[in-house]
């Protein structure tokens, strides 16, 4: 027991040292903010954040043996950076709402709890918030591994001049939530149609006699469950904390490989980090082999394409545009050359942005 007592003393000493260093970091962040403000420099620099994350992950693994989990380290440093940044300026983030949805969760994972968040009713509203500079950033869903692409997000890039400034990939884990503390009390289950579709087998097997009801969002389902102990909601863990609901059953989604990718949008371009993606859209001429000739450019320059999607151009029937994600930054020599060639082989080319790849997804 004496050894336990001494170890706890050592933990107390370390905690005090961590607290001292956090306050030192906060003071430095405030000073940096003052310098940036005087020089009219952007307060938030995502490229610098990426550099910090990569450094601490590398040090944790290579120098300290990786005893502390990498994913937990990312979450901790996200909040440290978010809190320090808020001392310089409160970052304003618009997202597809309402609160406690997966888009809200993605935004929190990217910007931390110290940012100021504005939920929006539609994807278009998120774009408008960024375009009008009412928000510094926006967060919108773009694709799910089961449900596919979010077409409305892609369509917005056809008409908007905002840039892609980041991506977030999160696992979609669904839970049965309720104000009751027993699953036996649940008589109705509410959720968004997509969430219900993704856990249909579990519901049929475990709650075969329960009525399943679609509502406009997982957040609305939680609001109903909060008021009625006989109601259950299918939603995220963030929703459980937000609405103070009990988690009656965890991970009820039918597939374990359920991920959603979100895009961060902004008004400015980002500098290369060395681990980037570039997103573009282009239209080809209505002639045989036009798409082949366009895509051949990337093969020629040894550039890997991670995604390609087609969407109607909305200009005339059977006219399509192509959305492509590729590895590399637009300022890299080979990417720059490829995009220059591509412009000559297409009707139009629009670079949507170059941005760091999602952390821990490389």
Curated annotation (Swiss-Prot):
Keywords: Amino-acid biosynthesis, Aromatic amino acid biosynthesis, Cytoplasm, Isomerase, Lyase, Multifunctional enzyme, Phenylalanine biosynthesis
Ranges where the Prephenate dehydratase domain occurs: 93-267
Residue numbers binding substrate: 8, 25, 36, 49
The organism's place on the tree of life at top rank: Bacteria
Essential for prephenate dehydratase activity, annotated site positions: 260
Single GO MF annotation: chorismate mutase activity
Enzyme nomenclature, EC number: 5.4.99.5, 4.2.1.51
Catalytically driven reaction(s): chorismate = prephenate; prephenate + H(+) = 3-phenylpyruvate + CO2 + H2O
Cell cycle found in the keyword field: no
GO biological process, one term: chorismate metabolic process
Annotated compartments: Cytoplasm
A GO CC term assigned to this protein in UniProt: cytoplasm
Pfam family name, one: ACT
Keyword Isomerase: yes
Pathway: Amino-acid biosynthesis; L-phenylalanine biosynthesis; phenylpyruvate from prephenate: step 1/1; Metabolic intermediate biosynthesis; prephenate biosynthesis; prephenate from chorismate: step 1/1
Primary location recorded for the protein, binned into one broad class: cytoplasm
Residues in ACT domain copies: 279-356
Residues of the Chorismate mutase domain: 1-92
InterPro entries: ACT-like_dom_sf, ACT_dom, Chor_mutase/pphenate_deHydtase, Chorismate_II_sf, CM_dom_sf, CM_II_prokaryot, Preph_deHydtase, Preph_deHydtase_CS
Function of the protein: Catalyzes the Claisen rearrangement of chorismate to prephenate and the decarboxylation/dehydration of prephenate to phenylpyruvate.
Protein name: Bifunctional chorismate mutase/prephenate dehydratase
Gene giving rise to this polypeptide: pheA
């Amino acid at each position: 027991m004496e050894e336990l007592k001494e170890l706890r003393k050592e933990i107390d000493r370390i905690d005090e040292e961590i607290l001292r260093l956090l306050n030192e970091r906060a003071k430095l962040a405030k000073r940096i903010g003052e310098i940036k403000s005087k020089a009219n420099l952007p307060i938030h620099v995502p490229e610098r954040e990426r550099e910090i994350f990569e450094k601490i992950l590398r040090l944790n693994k290579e120098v300290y043996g990786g005893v502390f989990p990498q994913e937990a380290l990312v979450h901790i440093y996200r909040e440290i950076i978010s809190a320090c940044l808020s001392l310089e300026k409160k970052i304003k983030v618009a997202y597809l709402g309402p609160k406690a949805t997966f888009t809200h969760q993605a935004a929190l994972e990217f910007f931390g709890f110290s940012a100021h968040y504005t939920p929006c009713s539609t994807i278009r509203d998120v774009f408008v918030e960024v375009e009008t500079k009412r928000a510094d950033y926006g967060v919108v869903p773009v694709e799910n591994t089961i449900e596919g692409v979010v077409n409305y997000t892609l369509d917005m890039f056809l008409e908007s001049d905002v840039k892609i400034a980041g991506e977030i990939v999160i696992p979609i884990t669904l839970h049965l939530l309720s104000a009751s503390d027993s699953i036996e009390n649940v008589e109705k289950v509410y959720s968004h149609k997509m969430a219900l579709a993704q856990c249909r087998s579990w519901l049929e097997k475990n709650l075969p006699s329960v009525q399943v009801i679609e509502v406009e969002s997982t957040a609305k389902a939680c609001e109903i469950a909060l008021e009625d102990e006989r109601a259950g909601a299918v939603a995220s863990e963030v929703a459980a904390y937000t609405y103070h609901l009990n988690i009656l059953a965890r991970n009820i989604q039918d597939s374990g490989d359920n991920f959603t990718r979100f895009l961060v949008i902004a008004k400015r371009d980002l500098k290369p980090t060395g681990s980037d993606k570039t997103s573009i859209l282009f239209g080809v001429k209505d002639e045989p082999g036009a798409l082949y000739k366009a895509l051949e450019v990337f093969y020629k320059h040894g550039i890997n394409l991670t995604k390609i999607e087609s969407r109607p151009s909305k200009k005339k029937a059977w006219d399509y545009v192509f959305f492509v994600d590729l590895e590399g930054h637009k300022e890299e020599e080979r990417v720059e050359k490829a995009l220059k060639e591509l412009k000559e082989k297409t009707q139009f080319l629009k670079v949507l942005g170059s941005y760091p790849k999602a952390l821990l997804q490389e």
